[in-house]
Amino acid sequence: MIIQRVVLDSRPGKNGNPVAENFRVEEVSLPDTINEGQVRVRTLYLSVDPYMRCKMNEETGADYLAPWQLAQVADGGGLGVIEESKHQKLAKGDFVTSFYWPWQTKAILDGNGLEKVDPQLVDGHLSYFLGAIGMPGLTSLIGVQEKGHVSAGSNQTMVVSGAAGACGSLAGQIGHLLGCSRVVGICGTHEKCLFLTSELGFDAAVNYKTGNVAEQLREACPDGVDVYFDNVGGDISNAVISQMNQNSHIILCGQISQYNKDVPYPPPLPPAVEAIQKERNITRERFMVLNYKDRFEPGILQLSQWFKEGKLKIKETVANGLENMGVAFQSMMTGGNIGKQIVRISEDSSP
């Protein structure tokens, strides 16, 4: 059986911007038979995410991430349908997902590494399992709960950077749902700002490309900032931290502005900003959702309930075809997406 796959063809360099040409599509042969415990799957959707930029380097700089190897298939969040199974708990026609799904049209996988999903949780929108009802949703929910210390009735102001992206667009809504009295998003286009305030219920939005971020934040957050969901790092985060209140909290979700630079993760703050953090007793801890696996099942059910009740709005940017994985990744890294960037590999979900 001949299938297509995407391999890493070249590295952008630790300080380079990734381009679509760093990836290559090739045809390979897939065995016709599977072994006990294995399943053959057809890929329906693949995810591209900022953390993958680290995997393009020879060393990721993160102890929980292994680098992609040159000329080897890339992997990440994926979802597919089982075409054949020799695994006792998985059957033909089941929908399954994995955090380590190969970028292939079809694959033979170890069934023990797959998670069966229920289409009813997403009203049939299977790609949502790679976004709002999946890892980005869990990251946003558990991050706000564990590191944001949000409590209803506390009159807290929350700021979200990268607010129109996969995690940011969810984190702001979740902040409201858990009790924040004011939620402000930071993003890079007028269209995204409008999306945040008119569709997602953010109280205000700051466009970092059209004005002074610090001044816009002072206007949008007259009572200062109590919770900061940080997706970007860099100058934007420095501006936010400078306006945070005593005993406030930073949820360190990502640092996309720093991923193309040869710096440690999380990167250290400039001395003046670090002094503010210490003086005001602001918590800033690296958040790893994979450390909270016992919270995944109740978290997915909560996210699904909010979605079905219309309280959690979900937005996707969808590219089509395995050949566009590199294009979608490059676009996502430069802010071309609103909501979760997804790549549809096959439209046929039948087994």
Swiss-Prot record:
Pfam families reported for this sequence: ADH_N_2, ADH_zinc_N
Binding site for substrate: 99-100, 288-290
Positions contributing to NADP(+) binding: 165-168, 192, 208, 231, 253-259, 287-289, 337
Any one Gene Ontology BP term: prostaglandin metabolic process
EC number: 1.3.1.48
InterPro entries listed in its UniProt record: ADH-like_C, ADH_N_2, GroES-like_sf, MDR_fam, NAD(P)-bd_dom_sf, PTGR2
Subcellular location: Cytoplasm
Job description of the protein: Functions as 15-oxo-prostaglandin 13-reductase and acts on 15-keto-PGE1, 15-keto-PGE2, 15-keto-PGE1-alpha and 15-keto-PGE2-alpha with highest activity towards 15-keto-PGE2. Overexpression represses transcriptional activity of PPARG and inhibits adipocyte differentiation.
Oligomer and partners: Monomer.
Family affiliation: Belongs to the NADP-dependent oxidoreductase L4BD family.
The protein's name: Prostaglandin reductase 2
